[in-house]
Amino acid sequence: MICFAPSRTHACSWLLAALGCVCGASQAAVVRISVSDAAGSPLPQAVVLLESVSAKLSVKPMPTVEVSQLKRQFSPQVTLLTVGTPVVFSNFDTVRHHVYSFSPAKTFELKLYAGVPNQPVVFDKPGVSIVGCNIHDQMAAWIVVADTPLHGLSDAQGQVRIDAVAAGNYRMWVWHPGLPALTDGVVSSLTVGQADLTQAVQLDALAAPKASKP
């Protein structure tokens, strides 16, 4: 494209910028990850994080997330969020709960309460926090805090889709609460080009542990 006329300089600059945006967007790929369990069946509630090897990607907190307590269970059982995201632990049961976590990623305690706590809990460090109830031992939930904007939680078919992944080399971390104790997840290398990418991951895990009946 040639632009000589001074009167068209602004229009040409705008068009060049727009084309640059389009070209930049076209270089971002969609990464699809299929997660299966030890038996080869689709594994829901698996967490996938992509971390760039060459650069620290900017990440922002999410809007307030709710983890509810109903029928003496946490819902959702696995929650994926980014660093700095506040979480409200709403109690919809007719009994009071005592919600806590002693995990290094986030230690907190919400003593016996009903309804909605006065303040949310801000998860300000990356990692996995196991949440329980000091009154009802069968209750358990997992809060996974990501320090990357490239993340996803597998659906009922074990599928994760991560959009806008720039070309480059990444560390892919896959985790599930059904992994053996003391397992920190599975880490592998992933190279992303300009084309969309599909990856399959099998974990030595079964479905997420279900809360036992009270």
Model-derived regions: residue spans:
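Bacterial N-terminal signal peptides
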Residues: 13-24
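Bacterial N-terminal signal peptides that target proteins for export
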Residues: 2-15
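Extracytoplasmic copper-binding redox domains, predominantly the cupredoxin/blue-copper superfamily
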Residues: 28-159, 163-214
